[in-house]
């Protein structure tokens, strides 16, 4: 999957904003006043919550984001503004006497002991002013994200949706409550399974969920539903397409606080950049698997997401990695100071000589890219009887090696064009070549890189293996 450049994507986030405070420390004894633990507070920090956390997630992915909501001219509001300014999030507020919502959590040993909420109802006049502000600005954005926490800022959400639709701006909604009809006309609504079943009733199984989702889409006149299902992954159901079911990618779950914010933020950023809805959902699923490994309200950066995609591709055998995808991963590695090594070959009938060579190549740096000749390229080099193993199989075998980070195919006789594009730090070739005879060497040198020649291990050859197999078949035929 390609990671788009999100820097030109403009997203407007509107909804219930709040400040999340965290006090943490050691709980070493029980209070003599009541049967509750005493926490000796050692650390205090504040984070943006609710719709503000959605905006932070979008900013961390590199998109241009503006946040609109209702806050108070109070200390909580001041702290929230500081967090947003540090993250580069622009904001337009409706100020209200109801104040800024704050949720204070007390933790010990990463376990939440208690949460205290500071909040008042948002006045209707403030909510009306917010809807008017959205209508005035929404045309300037690629996507409108509505983050509903049922705190009162979205009393006129219908007007916001209609304003966006009139400007052909997609509307993605993270919902709340048991009345989804107020979201009529939205592009997508993203409930979790509990919120979804509150509307449609308990789902007996996955097929039942899909059927009920299709019915709800028709009833409330939206284009799609994305049902997040915790450890069961996600289900995307579109009006004019089939269902897309994604398994959960999370291996460890420490805290689900704000995970829904990350999902809607990643989905909106990807969709706003031009990706299809299914591809955007896949990206959001990867982001969710990252954020649940963090404690408290957190975000996922573009670098973290790209690294997660890298791990996902490795798990899947790299069957669909493109040059652009590998190029992106190489750039990320180099930006972190990692030395990227490049080598190439046909790798037909992978043998221990190949494995030893690749291990030695990997030791020349931190990351190893292996470029593999396509089937057509192998035929040009080896003749019509080759390859023995098709490209997909050769790539899968190579990707299973722990020394190999990324595998990418090429169609030409040499990988010179690919080398010039990827710009590795070290170019490695096996055999008795002189460095200046190696395809792509000049490109690497021009960019300050190194070229290394490694020895092949004697006695290992795919051609020799093929000859032995043919000899064995001849002998077996003669014996019969």
From Swiss-Prot:
The keyword Oxidoreductase does not apply. Its EC number is 2.7.1.167, 2.7.7.70. It catalyses: D-glycero-beta-D-manno-heptose 7-phosphate + ATP = D-glycero-beta-D-manno-heptose 1,7-bisphosphate + ADP + H(+); D-glycero-beta-D-manno-heptose 1-phosphate + ATP + H(+) = ADP-D-glycero-beta-D-manno-heptose + diphosphate. One of its GO terms (cellular component) is cytosol. Gene3D superfamilies: 3.40.1190.20, HUPs. ATP binds at residues 192-195. Pathway: Nucleotide-sugar biosynthesis; ADP-L-glycero-beta-D-manno-heptose biosynthesis; ADP-L-glycero-beta-D-manno-heptose from D-glycero-beta-D-manno-heptose 7-phosphate: step 1/4; Nucleotide-sugar biosynthesis; ADP-L-glycero-beta-D-manno-heptose biosynthesis; ADP-L-glycero-beta-D-manno-heptose from D-glycero-beta-D-manno-heptose 7-phosphate: step 3/4. Keywords: ATP-binding, Carbohydrate metabolism, Kinase, Multifunctional enzyme, Nucleotide-binding, Nucleotidyltransferase, Transferase. One of its GO terms (molecular function) is heptose 7-phosphate kinase activity. CDD domains: RfaE_like. One of its GO terms (biological process) is ADP-L-glycero-beta-D-manno-heptose biosynthetic process. The active site is at 261. Residues 342-480 are annotated as: Cytidylyltransferase. Residues 1-316 are annotated as: Ribokinase. In the N-terminal section; belongs to the carbohydrate kinase PfkB family. In the C-terminal section; belongs to the cytidylyltransferase family. HAMAP family: HldE. Homodimer. This is Bifunctional protein HldE. It comes from Hydrogenovibrio crunogenus (strain DSM 25203 / XCL-2). The gene is hldE.
């Amino acid at each position: 999957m390609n990671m788009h450049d999100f820097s030109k994507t403009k997203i407007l986030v509107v909804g219930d904003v709040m400040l999340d405070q965290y006090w943490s420390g050691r709980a070493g004894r029980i209070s003599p006043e009541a049967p509750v633990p005493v926490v000796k507070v050692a650390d205090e920090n504040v984070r943006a919550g609710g719709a503000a956390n959605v905006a932070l997630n979008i900013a961390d992915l590199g998109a241009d984001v503006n946040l609109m909501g209702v806050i108070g001219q109070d200390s909580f509001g001041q702290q929230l503004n500081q967090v947003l300014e540090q993250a580069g999030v622009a904001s337009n507020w409706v100020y209200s006497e109801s104040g800024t919502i704050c949720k204070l959590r007390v933790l010990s040993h990463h376990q939440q002991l208690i949460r205290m909420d500071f909040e008042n109802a948002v006045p209707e006049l403030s909510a009306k002013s917010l809807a008017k502000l959205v209508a005035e600005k929404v045309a300037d954005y690629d996507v409108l994200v509505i983050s509903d926490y049922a705190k009162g800022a979205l009393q006129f959400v219908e007007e916001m949706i209609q304003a966006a639709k009139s400007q052909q701006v997609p509307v993605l909604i993270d919902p709340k409550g048991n009345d989804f009809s107020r979201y009529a006309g939205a592009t997508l609504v993203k409930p979790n399974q509990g919120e979804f079943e509150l509307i449609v009733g308990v789902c007996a199984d996955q097929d039942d969920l899909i059927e009920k989702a299709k019915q709800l889409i028709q009833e409330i006149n939206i284009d799609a539903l994305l049902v997040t299902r915790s450890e069961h992954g996600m289900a995307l159901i579109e009006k004019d397409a089939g269902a897309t079911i994604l398994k959960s990618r999370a291996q460890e779950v420490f805290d689900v606080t704000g995970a829904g914010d990350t999902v809607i933020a990643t989905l909106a950023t990807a969709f706003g950049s031009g990706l299809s809805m299914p591809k955007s959902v896949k990206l959001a699923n990867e982001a969710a698997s990252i954020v649940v490994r963090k404690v408290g309200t957190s975000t996922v950066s573009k670098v973290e997401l790209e690294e997660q995609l890298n791990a996902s591709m490795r798990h899947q055998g790299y069957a669909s990695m493109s040059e652009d995808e590998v190029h992106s991963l190489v750039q990320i590695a180099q930006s972190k100071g990692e030395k990227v090594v490049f080598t190439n070959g046909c790798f037909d009938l992978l043998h221990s000589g190949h494995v030893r060579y690749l291990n030695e190549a990997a030791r020349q740096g931190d990351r190893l890219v292996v470029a593999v000749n396509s089937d057509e390229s192998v035929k040009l080099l080896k003749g019509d009887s080759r390859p023995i193993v098709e490209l997909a199989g050769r790539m899968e075998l190579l990707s299973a090696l722990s020394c190999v980070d990324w595998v990418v195919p090429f169609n030409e006789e040499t990988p010179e064009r690919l080398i010039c594009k990827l710009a590795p730090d070290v170019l490695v070739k096996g055999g008795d070549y002189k460095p200046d005879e190696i395809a792509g060497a000049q490109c690497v040198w021009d960019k300050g890189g190194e070229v290394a020649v490694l020895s092949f291990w004697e006695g290992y050859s795919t051609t020799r293996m093929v000859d032995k197999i043919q000899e064995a078949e001849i002998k077996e035929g003669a014996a019969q």
